[in-house]
């Protein structure tokens, strides 16, 4: 197949990220990339990089994602940018979809049946899926000749066994209402697994890994024989690790209890657990770990406590996944913003594991701070590899989109 132009779209509740690629198998060139922010306001911003230039438009009246798409098209095709000459040059559009439920085990070409299924599970990701669906529908109007592909953050985890994904709630909740662990960050984990296989020169099917995706949102994935075996996020991204603003694991009775005490609805309490908890909640200052480290290094109590709680939770999950994988793993990998740049978090997360042969090289670890560079930070005496690998979720979407277009 000749080089084709593919547009990658990542729809947020008030933003639209995009990258335009010229792509041929395992060879990609970025033609343009950018973001439209503050959608649904009169202060919207468009930032776009192309041909070593940066274009920024501010104070735009963009009241909907539909209008944002029209601005995007205008920006890609106008005489000033000349990124593409006409819309039909774009042959494929890959969408990142937060939640695919249990229906979508792989990326798929979008048709009306796929859209109907997505609408049925919109309640599982009410902040993201409905807007993504609207964007897809608008894209069918704007790009009638392009094939659209849905790539799901949940698909990677569809290989989990029932013992890993079921909650110990009435079984009818699962059968009738699809209440179960789905997991997220799947596009990241798929990329990291594939990349680790290349680095270690092993077949993917032979890989057992523990991958830590540590950013403002954070999760851990146990990988057995190259497939997702267990993960920390659940029905929603709220379960699991302590995150920037999310609480992670809590006793569920806290919700009705605090609802009664604070005289707030359960929806309001859920919002607090999602947006006012985690590192922000404990530190009482910030969800940004860089800010928290400044305070922690000045011996500020809550900031130190936030780091301790965060890394303690990570250690517990690493230990439990080591046991779940029968202590048979090839590597532990750190990825995403915090995972690739914060050597202290990596050190604290693995503290104590040297007693079972998982040994970090402190000097290598301290030097591993470039978010765009891969590192091996394991000691020569370590029984397994400890790696730092920047993730590339867009590349997973790009490759899946290309493969599906090529074969259909």
Curated annotation (Swiss-Prot):
Q: What is its EC number?
A: 2.7.2.1
Q: Name one GO cellular component term.
A: cytoplasm
What InterPro entries does UniProt report for this protein, alphabetically?
A: Ac/propionate_kinase (IPR004372), Aliphatic_acid_kin_short-chain (IPR000890), Aliphatic_acid_kinase_CS (IPR023865), ATPase_NBD (IPR043129)
Protein residues bound to ATP: 17, 213-217, 288-290
What the entry lists under CDD domains is as follows:
ASKHA_NBD_AcK_PK (cd24010)
Name the positions where substrate binds.
Answer: 96
Subcellular location per the Swiss-Prot or TrEMBL entry? Cytoplasm
Enumerate the cofactors the protein uses: Mg(2+); Mn(2+)
User: Using the chain's own numbering, where are the disulfide bonds?
Assistant: none
Q: Where is the active site?
A: 153
Query: Pathway it acts in?
Result: Metabolic intermediate biosynthesis; acetyl-CoA biosynthesis; acetyl-CoA from acetate: step 1/2
What are this entry's molecular-function GO terms? Answer: acetate kinase activity; ATP binding; magnesium ion binding
Q: Which GO terms describe its biological process?
A: acetate metabolic process; acetyl-CoA biosynthetic process
Keyword Transport included in the entry's annotation: no
The UniProt annotation places Mg(2+) binding at 10, 393
Q: Which reaction does it catalyse?
A: acetate + ATP = acetyl phosphate + ADP
Cofactor note from UniProt? Answer: Mg(2+). Can also accept Mn(2+).
Q: Per the record, where is site Transition state stabilizer?
A: 185, 246
Q: Which family does it belong to?
A: Belongs to the acetokinase family.
Subunit structure comment from the entry = Homodimer.
Record function comment:
Catalyzes the formation of acetyl phosphate from acetate and ATP. Can also catalyze the reverse reaction.
Q: What is this protein called?
A: Acetate kinase
Organism this protein belongs to: Borrelia recurrentis (strain A1)
Identify the coding gene: ackA
């Amino acid at each position: 197949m000749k080089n084709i132009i593919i547009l990658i779209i990542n729809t947020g509740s008030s933003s639209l990220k995009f990258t335009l690629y010229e792509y041929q198998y395992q060879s990609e060139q970025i033609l343009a990339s950018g973001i439209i922010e503050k959608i649904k306001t009169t202060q919207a911003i468009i930032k776009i990089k192309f041909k070593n230039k940066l274009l920024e438009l501010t104070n735009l009246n963009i009241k909907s994602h539909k209008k944002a798409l029209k601005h995007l098209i205008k920006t890609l095709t106008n005489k000033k940018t000349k990124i593409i000459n006409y819309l039909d040059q774009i042959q494929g559009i890959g969408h990142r979809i937060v939640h695919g439920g249990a229906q979508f085990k792989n990326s798929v070409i979008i048709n009306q049946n796929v859209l109907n299924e997505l609408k049925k599970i919109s309640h599982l990701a009410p902040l993201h899926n409905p807007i993504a669906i609207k964007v897809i529908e608008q894209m069918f109007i704007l790009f009638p000749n392009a094939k659209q592909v849905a790539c799901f953050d949940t698909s990677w985890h569809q290989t989990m066994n029932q013992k890993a994904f079921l909650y110990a709630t009435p079984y009818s909740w699962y059968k009738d209402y699809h209440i179960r662990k789905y997991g997220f960050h799947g596009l990241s984990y798929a990329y990291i697994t594939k990349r680790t296989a290349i680095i270690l020169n092993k077949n993917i099917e032979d890989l057992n890994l523990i991958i830590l995706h540590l950013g403002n949102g954070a999760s851990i994935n146990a990988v057995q024989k190259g497939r997702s075996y267990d993960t920390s996020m659940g029905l929603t991204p709220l379960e699991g690790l302590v995150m920037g603003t999310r609480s992670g694991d809590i006793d569920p009775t806290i919700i009705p209890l605090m609802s009664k005490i604070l005289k707030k609805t359960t929806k309001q309490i859920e919002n607090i657990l999602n947006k006012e908890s985690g590192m922000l909640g404990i530190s009482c200052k910030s969800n940004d770990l860089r800010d928290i480290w400044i305070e922690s290094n000045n011996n500020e109590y809550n900031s130190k406590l936030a780091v301790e709680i965060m890394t303690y939770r990570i250690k517990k999950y690493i230990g439990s996944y080591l046991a779940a994988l029968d202590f048979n793993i090839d590597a532990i990998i750190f990825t995403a913003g915090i995972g690739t740049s914060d050597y202290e978090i990596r050190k604290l997360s693995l503290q104590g594991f040297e007693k079972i042969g998982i040994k970090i090289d402190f000097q290598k670890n301290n030097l591993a701070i470039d978010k765009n560079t891969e590192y091996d930070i394991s000691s020569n005496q370590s029984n397994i590899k400890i790696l730092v690998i920047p993730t590339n979720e867009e590349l997973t979407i790009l490759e899946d989109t290309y493969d599906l277009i090529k074969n259909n």
